[in-house]
Amino acid sequence: MRTGNAN
């Protein structure tokens, strides 16, 4: 699983 953000 990958977590994070994309701006």
UniProtKB/Swiss-Prot annotation:
- Keyword Phosphoprotein present in the record's keywords: the answer is yes
Q: Which residues carry this modification: N-formylmethionine?
A: M1
GO biological process terms on file: defense response to bacterium
Disulfide partners: none
Arranged from A to Z, the UniProt key words for this protein are: Antibiotic, Antimicrobial, Formylation, Phosphoprotein, Plasmid
Task: State the organism named in the record.
Answer: Escherichia coli
- How would you describe the post-translational modification of this protein? The peptide moiety allows entry into the bacterial cell, where it undergoes proteolytic cleavage to release the aspartyl adenylate analog, which is responsible for aspartyl-tRNA synthetase inhibition. Can be processed by the non-specific oligopeptidases PepA, PepB and PepN.
Its recorded name reads Microcin C7
Modification Aspartic acid 1-[(3-aminopropyl)(5'-adenosyl)phosphono]amide, positions: N7
What does this protein's UniProt record list under function? Antibacterial peptide, active against enterobacteria including species of Klebsiella, Salmonella, Shigella, Yersinia and Proteus, and strains of E.coli. Inhibits protein translation by blocking aspartyl-tRNA synthetase function and inhibiting production of aminoacetylated tRNA-Asp.
The answer, when asked if Phosphoprotein is one of the entry's keywords, is yes
